Structure formats: C-alpha cells, structure tokens
Amino acid sequence: MKRFFLVAISFIAMVAISASAAPNPSTTKVPAFPGTLANARYVYVTSYDGGQFDPNLFFEDRSAINAVQNAIQNWGKLIIVYQPSQADIIIRVTSRPSEDLLAVYDAHEHSSFLWRVMGRDGLQSGETPLVTQFEKGFEGVQHNAR
C-alpha cells in the first residue's frame, strides 16, 4: 500500500511539473524572419492545394486565403496581387481542424519555404494570429534593415 501511495504521489508531482513547464502559446516567440524579405512589397496569397478560385479547393483553405488577404490589406504594409508573377513573396496557407499553416516563399525561386508558422485556429476569419506573427517578423526585419 505504501508503495502504491509513493508511486501515485510521484506521478502527480511529475504531471504538475510538466504542466507548469509547458510553453504559454500567447507568449511564444515569433520564428526568425529572413532578412532577404525586408524589401518585399507585393504578396500573392494561395493555398498548397490551389488558388483562391480553384473549384476543387477546400472551403477552409478558401476562407483562410480570404482571411490572410483581409488581414494584410488592413495592415497596409504589403500590396496584394492576384498573379504570382507580380509578387515578391508568396504566402501559402492550409487550414485544417487540427492545425493551420502559413508559409512564406520567394516568388522568384521555387525552393523550400523561407519562413513558416503553424497553430490551431490560426487563420480564422476576423482573427488571424499566424498573420500577426508574420507581421511582427516582417516589421522586425524592416526595423533591423534601417
């Protein structure tokens, strides 16, 4: 009985310690934003599964594209374009029930992403915390470039 009691207390202590050590999502650090994007002015927003007007695109992805475009237009630091050839950067989004994704690519190089952030409910209409993280990173790079 004493052994069971000791194991139970140890388990409770471990759970309490791990719960207190978990990062607070509201204070998580914004990933480093590449300095090569400091001069970007034009942005094209799309989904990994297709463009905004693709009839086969999931409704959630289409809504995420609209939410990101609206947030960027309200922010006013970048100009939305509707053709990838006119963009300096391309933002690709995916919205799923488990997690949303926002990634930034160089529009002129077809390579891996330059910056990426993920989170649950990060690209919902009216509230886009992933775009807020993008804005903070972008402003930080512009501030450092001066």
Q: Where are the language model's segments positioned?
A:
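A broad, structure-centric signal for solvent-exposed, well-ordered loop/edge residues
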Residues: A8, Q52, A87-D88, S111
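A short, hydrophobic beta-strand-centered structural micro-motif
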Residues: V45-S47, Q73, I79-A103
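Amphipathic beta-strand/beta-sheet edge segments enriched in Tyr/Trp
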Residues: I89-R146
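Bacterial N-terminal signal peptides
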Residues: V7-A16
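Positively charged n-region of N-terminal signal peptides that target proteins for export
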Residues: M1-F4
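Short amphipathic alpha-helical "recognition" segments used for binding
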Residues: L6-V7, E139
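A structural "domain/chain start" motif
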Residues: S20-N74, S85, L114-G119, E139-R146
